[in-house]
Amino acid sequence: MPTIQFLNPSRDSANVSAYSKTVLLDIMRIAGIPQIVITSTTRTAHEQARIMYENLEQHGIEHQKKLYGPYGDKIIDEYAILKRKGKIKTEIISGMTKRINALGPRNVSKHAGDPSKLNVIDIAPGSITISARSKFEATINNDDRISTFLTPPKDPAYHLEIPQPD
């Protein structure tokens, strides 16, 4: 039986519905994946700002602008402005958080939306063997229960969006 693990169980396990767990387990069985590690689910505005900050530091502005839409780009612009002003990490994340809240967290990232309507799940690519990744990706692409699926290098993680049944 495949297993779903959480990088941060106390934060994330309650944000993945029984329905989404069934979807993931079905995909894992079909693709022959014994285990996955979920790295992120629903986020607060502050968590979203922190993650965006870390990704901007690691991947750069240009790369991250390809990942987000117009609202996310405004947060990236806020990062760039604060960075140019010589602000420290905590000040930059605080400024980004304020901007996210002003724009509406759900507009910036679906991770900041309502999990009772949409489960947004990031899976660590490293939790899936390289040889199994193409079958895993194909299985997800063929599953109508997944509304959006992003893969590296566009997204650092496997990013799945699973609409919740009414």
PLM segments and residue spans:
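Solvent-exposed coil/turn segments that connect beta secondary-structure elements
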Residues: 43, 55-56, 128, 165
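Stable alpha-helical elements in mature extracytoplasmic
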Residues: 16-23, 47-48, 132, 136
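Active-site acidic/histidine clusters and adjacent loop/turn architecture
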Residues: 2-42, 60-78
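Catalytic cores and adjacent binding grooves of peptidoglycan-active enzymes
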Residues: 71-166
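Active-site nucleophilic cysteine motif
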Residues: 20, 45, 117-120
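Periplasmic OmpA-like peptidoglycan-binding domain that tethers envelope proteins to the cell wall
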Residues: 50-56, 64-67, 115-119
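Acidic helix-start/capping segments at beta-turn-to-alpha-helix junctions
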Residues: 37-54
